[in-house]
């Protein structure tokens, strides 16, 4: 993951329009699935989108080394989301086993447990 763009009003009922920018540092011999989670500080996942990259049209095994791949996702903040802090996290996993790909450069990324990246944190207030 070399970058992302996020568009939203960050209010209950709003969409989270997320564009991820991936770049393969080496040839990938397996096809991974991308996961995107909206998780509250209570540990509950309130929105989730797991999908092969580019809606399945461009599997990771076909990525060329150095090529930048643009990958869009839409999640929605539930209308009844409780007032608390939230984090949007992303990562990759093997669909057959569920094993997540480890993050290699945690200094450059906001790693959350070594197998996902915390992209953005925000609060939803009361009322």
Where do the model's predicted regions map?
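C-terminal luminal/periplasmic domains and tails of membrane-associated envelope-modifying transferases
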Residues: 1-127
